[in-house]
């Protein structure tokens, strides 16, 4: 436990509450002191949802310390059951309840005697896991509970759907553009002729968890949450899962190929690979089949329209998706739907070639962004990092060869010092890196949680799929400040004229700039002024000079 000015991953109970509040008609009760109940305010402010946050704090106060928690916790569970009639009440411990060594499982058992509602104690170790790990674990625990419950009641239907279907696991509240990504994933799956079976946990009911085995496969867009659930379903029902994040042109194409390959192999194993059998199941008219055969004869490449001719051929020919169909779809989407492919070859984007960047965020977004910047947009990534220390090995493997160095840390001062040391042209990180960039006057594009309210947009801004590629291209290009444009605006008194600000993370340098020194510094073009200022201050410190004049600037230049 440590006192921190900024945390990338919150305590474990925040992850549990994020999962619980993502489900519909699920109420969470946390046994915590005042101060730990900030989740309600945070979610209400950031998530921009109309519903109230379904979380109640069972406050640990002096009465609890004197008499024990059992009566208060059980009363809170019973009261919420009567008031809200939820499908599930999830009790989450906190660091405080762990310190007090409360037997919360006993409280849950006692409350269940008088209730018909399911009551679960979140099984997370608050001293060993962080917010994201706890969220992953809680989602798996709730899924396991309801699938085993359905097994006991004989209500578990593991019969696969007739048409290819998929579950999307890991979309939940306070995630980075998760709702927008989910819409884009549904569109992508629809293009491939795959229906969505369930989306867990965002907007789902716990009773629908028993339907998860009906799907053909699971799609996990983010490594942080959903992977444990997918592994559980793989172990119990032999359900394949795809964990490649479709972010960027290359990885989106890879994900599409994996999906089509998985569906093709499952079709063969399910025995739906013959035209006669599939024709009988889908009731496609002979007129439609004749139309498709004519389309197949003329396979000229052209932009896809709403009827999806290219994939329509593949689905209506009844066989598994062939590599030719998949590659044609990817080519059409890359050239006509995504604008990033041609934009990356344009003169505007070539201005970014060789620009230096630093990337930091959660493992999924930081790794994907590093690869996009390097191989798709021609930038030079000095350092790629993540605060997901538990996923460090996977992250290193993903970014190997795409950056100069790798940083695994949850200390914001470390990445801040790296940024100040390398002085990149742009930063791509979290809200904290945005603050650092403002202090150092380095532009920053936000690509990962934790973020503030401006990164919970009301408009449609996915980061996944082919539309997400367009959003990323805009973000990258708009994040960079064009040096000559800024310089010209300053020369002609444009709106970007600004005073020299302090650009070191430590403001107590003990140096004083004279008026003539500042005048000389202001003559330096804006896009290199900050670097010149830092170099002069560094020179002055080495020479034990306390006042920086124009002569000191000239001496630093000659040194």
UniProtKB/Swiss-Prot annotation:
Superkingdom field: Eukaryota
Q: Which residues of this protein are catalytic? A: 348 (proton donor)
Cite the annotated pathway.
Answer: Porphyrin-containing compound metabolism; chlorophyll biosynthesis (light-independent)
Q: Extract the coiled-coil ranges from the record.
A: none
Enzyme Commission number, as recorded: 1.3.7.7
Q: Which cofactor does it need?
A: [4Fe-4S] cluster
The cofactor remark states: Binds 1 [4Fe-4S] cluster per heterodimer. The cluster is bound at the heterodimer interface by residues from both subunits.
Task: Report any one BP term from Gene Ontology.
Answer: light-independent chlorophyll biosynthetic process
What is catalysed by this protein?
Answer: chlorophyllide a + oxidized 2[4Fe-4S]-[ferredoxin] + 2 ADP + 2 phosphate = protochlorophyllide a + reduced 2[4Fe-4S]-[ferredoxin] + 2 ATP + 2 H2O
Per its record, what are the GO molecular function terms? 4 iron, 4 sulfur cluster binding; ATP binding; metal ion binding; oxidoreductase activity, acting on iron-sulfur proteins as donors; oxidoreductase activity, acting on the CH-CH group of donors, iron-sulfur protein as acceptor
Q: Where is the signal peptide?
A: none
Q: Where is it chiefly localized?
A: plastid
A Pfam family: Oxidored_nitro
- What Gene Ontology cellular component terms go with this record? chloroplast
Q: Where in the cell is it found?
A: Plastid, Chloroplast
Asked if Transmembrane helix is a keyword of the record, the answer is no
Where, in this chain's numbering, is substrate bound? 483-484
Q: What class of enzyme is it?
A: oxidoreductase
Sequence similarity: Belongs to the ChlB/BchB/BchZ family.
Q: What does this protein do?
A: Component of the dark-operative protochlorophyllide reductase (DPOR) that uses Mg-ATP and reduced ferredoxin to reduce ring D of protochlorophyllide (Pchlide) to form chlorophyllide a (Chlide). This reaction is light-independent. The NB-protein (ChlN-ChlB) is the catalytic component of the complex.
* Record protein name field: Light-independent protochlorophyllide reductase subunit B
């Amino acid at each position: 436990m440590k006192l921190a000015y900024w945390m990338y991953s919150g305590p474990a109970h925040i992850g549990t509450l994020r999962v619980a509040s993502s489900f519909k008609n699920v109420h969470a009760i946390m046994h915590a002191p005042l101060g730990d109940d900030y989740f309600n305010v945070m979610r209400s402010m950031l998530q921009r949802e109309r519903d109230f946050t379904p979380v109640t704090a069972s406050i640990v106060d002096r009465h609890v310390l004197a008499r024990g928690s059992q009566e208060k916790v059980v009363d809170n569970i019973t009261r919420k059951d009567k008031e809200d009639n939820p499908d599930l009440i999830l009790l989450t411990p906190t660091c405080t309840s762990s310190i007090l060594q409360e037997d919360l499982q006993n409280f849950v058992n006692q409350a269940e005697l008088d209730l018909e509602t399911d009551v679960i104690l979140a099984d997370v170790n608050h001293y060993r896991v962080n917010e994201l790990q706890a969220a992953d674990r809680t989602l798996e625990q709730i899924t396991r509970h309801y699938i085993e419950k359905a097994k006991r009641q004989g209500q578990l239907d593991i019969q696969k759907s007739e048409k290819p279907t998929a579950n999307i696991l890991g979309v939940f509240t306070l995630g980075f553009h998760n709702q927008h990504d989910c819409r884009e994933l549904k569109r992508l799956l629809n293009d491939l002729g795959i229906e969505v079976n369930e989306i867990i946990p965002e907007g789902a009911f716990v009773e629908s968890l028993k339907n998860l085995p009906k799907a053909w496969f699971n799609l996990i867009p983010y490594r942080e949450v959903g992977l444990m659930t997918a592994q559980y379903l793989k172990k119990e029902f032999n359900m394949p899962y795809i964990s490649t994040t479709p972010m960027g042109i290359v990885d989106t194409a890879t994900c599409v190929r994996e999906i089509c390959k998985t569906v093709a192999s499952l079709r063969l194993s399910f025995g739906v690979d013959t035209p006669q059998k599939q024709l009988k199941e889908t009731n496609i008219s002979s007129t439609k089949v004749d139309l498709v055969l004519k389309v197949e004869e003329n396979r000229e490449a052209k932009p896809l329209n709403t009827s999806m001719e290219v994939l329509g051929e593949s689905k209506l020919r009844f066989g598994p998706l062939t590599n030719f169909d998949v590659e044609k779809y990817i080519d059409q989407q890359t050239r006509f739907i995504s604008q990033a492919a041609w934009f990356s070859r344009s003169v505007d984007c070539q201005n970014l070639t060789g620009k230096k960047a630093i990337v930091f965020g959660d493992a999924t977004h930081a790794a994907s962004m590093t690869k996009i910047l390097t191989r798709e947009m021609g930038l030079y990534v000095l350092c790629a990092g993540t605060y997901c220390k538990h996923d460090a090995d996977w992250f290193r493997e993903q970014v190997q060869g795409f950056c100069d160095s790798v940083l695994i840390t949850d200390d914001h001062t470390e990445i801040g010092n790296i940024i100040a040391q390398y002085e990149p042209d742009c930063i791509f990180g979290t809200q904290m890196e945005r603050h650092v960039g403002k202090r150092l006057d380095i532009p920053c594009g936000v690509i990962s949680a934790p973020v503030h309210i401006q990164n919970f947009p009301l408009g449609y801004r996915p980061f996944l799929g082919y539309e997400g590629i367009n959003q990323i291209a805009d973000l990258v290009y708009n994040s960079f400040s064009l040096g000559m444009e800024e310089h010209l605006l300053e020369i002609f008194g444009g709106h970007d004229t600004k005073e020299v600000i302090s650009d070191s993370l430590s403001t107590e340098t003990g140096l004083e700039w004279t008026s003539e020194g500042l005048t000389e510094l202001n003559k330096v073009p804006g896009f290199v002024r900050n670097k010149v200022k830092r170099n002069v201050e560094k020179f002055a410190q080495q020479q034990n000079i306390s006042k920086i004049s124009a002569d000191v600037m000239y001496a630093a230049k000659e040194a």
